[in-house]
């Protein structure tokens, strides 16, 4: 079965999204505490 999006690409996308989410949360917390 050949798909345009492989499991590896999905995994990488999830890691990037999670990392961006963590950075966004840390930024919001730092701004809230400032």
From Swiss-Prot:
GO BP, sorted A to Z: photosynthesis
GO cellular component annotations of the record: photosystem I; plasma membrane-derived thylakoid membrane
Topology class, membrane: Single-pass membrane protein
Localization (cell): Cellular thylakoid membrane
Subcellular location, principal: membrane
Keywords: Membrane, Photosynthesis, Photosystem I, Thylakoid, Transmembrane, Transmembrane helix
Membrane-crossing segments per the record: 10-32
Annotated family: Belongs to the PsaM family.
Protein name according to UniProt: Photosystem I reaction center subunit XII
Classification of source organism: Bacteria, Bacillati, Cyanobacteriota, Cyanophyceae, Synechococcales
């Amino acid at each position: 079965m050949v798909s345009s999006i492989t499991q590896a690409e999905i995994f990488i996308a999830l890691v990037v999204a999670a990392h961006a989410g963590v950075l966004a949360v840390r930024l919001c917390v730092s701004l809230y505490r400032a």
